[in-house]
Amino acid sequence: EDIIYERSNTWISPDSGTTSGSRQTLITGEACRRACGKLMEDKKAGLSVEDMIGKVYYAEYLAKTDPLGANVPNPVSHVAYGYATQVCILDSKTGKIEEIVAAHDVGKAVNPLSCEGQIEGGVVMSIGFALREKYPIDENCKPISKYGSLGLFRAHEIPKIDAIVIDKPGLKVACGAIGIGEITSIP
């Protein structure tokens, strides 16, 4: 009852940019960590919880990137870099995928179970896109197929996926989180 939860609203909170991939874990996570650090400084200085009631602990983190096509040496295009590798095991008779092993360096895994789910989802999306999905459109870019005929994998058709989350400190921000968004679509 002492905590007020507000939904995201740019009328009352600053715009933190797009929520894409794992960007918010990094950007918002680091801003939150910095604000918590300020609170902890007050606690170490002897302030009680009652003394801190009503005090605002605010921090920002801006991950600077260069504009696309910037004429600068060593342009920065992403806030975080990860690493992933996959092994695809095929049935030698049918050519079908039996299993995919996908290992991803995510820095510090803030939510390991979510990381596994993100890897599995990215693998399914990638093999569907690579092997059988079609999204036909007409000359006006209007879809001409029904959802059920797009070639999406059904649950019973998905091969075994062994998602390996490599959890180790990454960047010196956001408690070491790197990200797990886009890189899962590599296979």
Residue ranges and their predicted role:
Residues 1-187:
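C-terminal catalytic domains of large/alpha subunits in multi-subunit enzymes
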